[in-house]
Amino acid sequence: MSAPPVPVVKPRLTFLYNGEFVDSDLQTKSVRESEDGRLYETFTIGGTLEVTTESIRHGDAIEWVSWFEYKGISDKSGQVTQLCDCNINVPFELDLYPDSLARIQEGRTTLVYAHNGSDWNEYDFSCDVESYGDRVLRKAALSQLPRYRAGNTNVKHFAPIGGRSSHGAFPFYNINQGDYGVIFAIGWTGQWNCDLERALDGTINIRTGLEDVDWHLLPGERIRTSSIIVMPYSSGYEKGQQAFRRLLRDYYSLIGKPGRPERAPLCMSFWGGLTSDGLVERIDKIGAERLGYEFAWVDAGWYGQFTEPSPNEFEGNWWAYTGDWSVNRHFHPDNLEDVSAACKRNNLGFLLWLEIERVNTKLPVVKAHPEYLIGDMIDLGNEAAWAWAYKTIANLIRRLNISCYRQDFNITPLGRWRDADAVDGRKGMHEIKYIMGLYRLWDSLLAEFPHLIIDNCASGGRRIDIETLRRSLPLWRDDYQCPANHDVDAAQNHNIAISRWLPYHGTSSGRIVGDTYRARSCYAPAFASSPLYSSTENPENLSDDDCAWIRRINNEFKKVRELMQGDYRPLVEMSPTVDRSTWSAYQYSLKDEGFVMAFRRAKSPFCEARFELCGIDPLKSYLFEDSDTGQTFTISGKELSEKGISVVIDQPRSSKLYFYKAIQG
């Protein structure tokens, strides 16, 4: 039997209004289209609750988001519950079982590719592949992580932990059956949820929205809820994933857009608790030695009025002053303006860390404006609190010529929102207004500062979704890389998994100099290192050999980064946990060129591996260059297509990087 035709997906949302089921497909709508191709479909419930769904198509993909507005003059609208911002049915054929003991035929298993989110673990971003049929089957090479277990039924439930969109779960999914499938991604930087349910005929119902809502609107209130991208495909799993990455790169990311940086940044990072003299000395070292960095990244610890030393993130009480965003004049007597000037004279962008949403409740802003808070969070849904947050950030960007604003968020907000909801009886409303305020904050900053990029941290990669990706990029995708000598094999796993989805993300190789395996393990579209991070690392101790190695690595990374604009493909199937007896490898291809990166891990007994490459033209030949030695060799496209490429790595815990380009056959 042939696969179902690729469906044309249309927006559909459902909810209960005062207990009555509302289906947008069954409503009479007014429709208008904007000049940029956006479609606005509006219907009204009960004569007073106006619901507008805004949608736009990019090729086979469609995105939509819904807005709710109360037009009545009485005290409130009816009650909205069981809201599904997306409620669609996607046709899939039943999995075939020739007999009770046989395996499902290849290509006829329906698989749900659901990746883990970030949770400071080695298995972050790994994939849990679940099949739907008369039984529950799994690919043997991938383990089931019990966090997502919903029982051996035809319903599977997904949700993040604690109100941050990619904490524990990852709001990007691919349901695949052979060549046919559908990718969808949820846009909500709070507590979304997703249910997948399979019908007896094989159809899969996709339901996404905000978790556990029960609210009404007041006169004049207008809110939005979660967005969704749905992209059907008929080209197979790998090409479907590549198409989705291109979609995010071309239509959602700010990188490469007018006024913004052409590429994600290459940074040297510093602890903000260093003195200004120490920061200036380190930044001048970058320029004097021509190390090749593009941004100076100043992290936490630069703010608050304390005098005790804070030599690194693990010493001192800098954390107690989070929420006081005045520069610490004891350690930075020139108000960080000398640091900004050092960046400018060394042709570096200035990246500065803040955590604008979290505040120590003993600080002056809390005493002056307790109404700004939900617990220990600045309430971005409160207009006065929002204005304070915007003014605080914008003044720093303007005064210090900030090129990249780094926003962290190290708390789980869900319980705080729910506690606030309990006061006024509108479950989910504080979350909705808070998240709308977050989007407005970033949109306003990007509008006022056309050069700006926003780094979205949130404890390392815990707020990654399509709404944050259109406004920011995660330069620090996981806090598992926090230790100075973090496990780089885990970084390889993270990189290989998350690159399936995101065209732009990053991490850091840490403070260790001279370890090429470590540095290459952390190459991503954005990359950082910190050889002069804290008071422990003295610029005078950075030798000529150290500087030469840093220059070589940064130059190599920039060459890699250009090719990361292309299509990505992992060349091995990784286990969720780190296996040091294996190899890991991946490929990027951009038109007729690309690179292959391979790692032989510390306990691998194998000195050779062969990899099948994608994007190879059998009628052409390909010139390969070894990045370590500069040696070149040629392989015909026919041989590459039939046999792949053999990579030899003689020593354990070593890597090989080959650049290649097509030449005439």
Residue spans of the language-model regions?
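Conserved, mostly hydrophobic/aromatic
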Residues: 66, 220, 296, 343, ...
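C-terminal beta-strand-rich structural cap/linker in extracellular carbohydrate-active enzymes
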Residues: 635-665
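Aromatic-lined carbohydrate-binding/catalytic grooves of carbohydrate-active enzymes
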Residues: 261-394, 400-404, 414-416, 421
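Glycine-rich, aromatic-flanked loop segments that form ligand/cofactor-binding clefts
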Residues: 11, 16-23, 171-187, 233-253, ...
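Polysaccharide-binding surfaces and accessory modules of carbohydrate-active proteins
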Residues: 2-197, 211, 621-634
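Active-site-proximal substrate-binding groove within the catalytic cores of carbohydrate-active enzymes
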Residues: 9-11, 16-25, 31, 209, ...
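Short Pro-Gly-centered flexible turn/kink motifs
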Residues: 215-234, 653-661
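Alpha-helix-loop-beta-strand connector modules within alpha/beta enzyme cores
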Residues: 336-343, 430-449
